[in-house]
From Swiss-Prot:
GO terms for molecular function: 4-(cytidine 5'-diphospho)-2-C-methyl-D-erythritol kinase activity; ATP binding. This is 4-diphosphocytidyl-2-C-methyl-D-erythritol kinase. Belongs to the GHMP kinase family. IspE subfamily. The active site is at K27, D152. It holds the Pfam family GHMP_kinases_N. InterPro entries: GHMP_kinase_C_dom (IPR013750), GHMP_kinase_C_sf (IPR036554), GHMP_kinase_N_dom (IPR006204), IspE (IPR004424), Ribosomal_Su5_D2-typ_SF (IPR020568), Ribsml_uS5_D2-typ_fold_subgr (IPR014721).
Amino acid sequence: MKNYQFSTALLSSQIQGKKLRFPCPAKINLFLYITSQRSDGYHELQTLFQFLNFGDWLSIEIRTDGKIILTPEIPHLKNEDNLIYRAAKLLQQKTGCTLGANLHLDKILPIGGGVGGGSSNAATALVALNYLWNTQLSLSTLAEIGLQLGADVPVFVYGKAAFAEGVGEKLTFCQPPQKWFLVLKPETSISTAIIFKDSNLPRNTSKRPLAELLTTKYENDCEKVVLNHYSEVEEALGWLLQYAPARLTGTGACVFAEFANEQAAQSAFLDKPEKYVGFVAQGTNISPLHQMIEYLSQQKQTLCLPNNTNSRG
């Protein structure tokens, strides 16, 4: 896996005439507690999302014919079912925008790792196209659209580290320490359904205020159940624990260790067994996507072709 991080210099270098490359950052769950199971089967939780300065890239070039062209195609997945394509079409439908786009995804994050790759891709499509098409929807409206695509998409749309409650829909923005992380992807994929159906999964962890949670040891209620089902995750986590405090993110499969500085994280990364893909990144409380949008706005870099007179808020 490519090992580089988003940076201000890297983001600013993505300006390429009428084509831009927008970051789709990874996220980790610094903690995750399951507080109850509702009558409809959904689980209520308390979790803390933080972005990483590492992720996929989505290249966008505006079209005037209204077509949405997405490359490359993913085997066994029609483009019409891809979250990026669906995000673009939903934005067109919501605003009446007559512009289109060529979209190209440079996939770097591991698929099925629990670091939010698909949700981040969809959010980047919404936020970036809203900027480029000049459709001028608010972040809250974009988040409502994003919720149709996935429960985690609104977090990426808002672009701020957040404490989530309920089934993930209640967000409180916050600023946890921006530590360095080594993230590993074991050679397995997790079935979320298996984890949440397991009778050993904690479902009654006491709800606590954010201030208390931020000052206590971070844990993940899904971790023990995942380790019981997936020995590959248990092995990867055990390796990380030799170097630093480590946990599962979400329901996995990715695990991460936290370090006080980049040097310590990179040193551990160099010892990584070859069978693991992984990367070193720093936590960031402002999404690199929003950092780039802010940079473009300051530079008055306008890539909308004709003004989109058919848009509406």
